[in-house]
Amino acid sequence: MKILENVNLSEILWYKIGGTARYVLQVENAQDLEKAIDFIKKEKLKRAFFLGYGSNLIFTDGSFDGAVIQFIAPEKSSVSLIRDNTVEAFAGESLDSVIKFAFDNSLVGLEWAGGLPGTVGAAIRGNVGAFGGEIQDVVKEVVIAEITNSKIVLKTLRRFELKFGYRTSLIKKRRNLVVVSVQFRLTPTDAKGIQSARQAYLNNTEYRKRRHPLEFPNCGSVFKNISDPEEVKKILETYPDLEEKIKRDWHGKVSMGYLIKRLELAGFRVGNAQISPKHCNFIVNLGGATQKDVLTIIRTIQGKFREAFDFTPEVEVEIVQ
């Protein structure tokens, strides 16, 4: 475990937003995690927050008087093949490293995630998805740490026990649970299948480069796409022309990026945070943006939705105060 003191979180988090944390504890394995919990207990810290890259977080601008436990990739990769079609990885490994390892071992099933930032642990916690795929589709089991009264107990949960939902899971709902490692059940294929999967991965990665504002720090999709049938109905009452697009292109949901643009909010700016004209469900950091700037934009979008559709869209990002 590596201990860092008085860390400017804007220098280590994906979004480049955040105040100063009293400690950052970097962990590379389950043993490091146990040491981190012991450290928190020894120092009598009252706050702790677990993260990977922080690619889906908006952290407070103020000081964080506690410990940020950051899962990082081990110096020696933990990604391994434990059975013919099962790949295991520590929570701090990048999701991309697992995809590439799978390809090298003639396994497919994760290519839809090409170009997604973030760690394995964060992917499980938020049940990440794209292009019709979700991480829950390929999870076999997860080793989690249950932390209670500064004690840590490791447990193995099977896929159905994780209670996956749209961009959520049991781990996200219960703040004392942390992903330690994951087993993915993937699909064996031949050389032609791998070639096809690699091409899908490249296509998805290129799509992100073209359509997402990767030239600026961002936290990915700020809002969940609209999936609730009643909310979809309200949108169709206002925009009946979207019915075919919802069925054909959006997998039954309604794209938040499209709706924000249609509400004429593209390019809306507060301080150094801006709704990206490139993809309106992204709020980019133009340089020196604050959490306050971003939250003001989020509330503006939610206000416009209440006026137009009589409901408030749900944020996908996690906001840490």
Residue ranges and their predicted role:
Residues 77-82, 144, 223, 317:
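A structural signal for short hydrophobic beta-strand segments in well-ordered beta-sheet cores
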Residues 36-40, 197-202, 297-301:
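Short amphipathic alpha-helices in soluble, non-transmembrane regions
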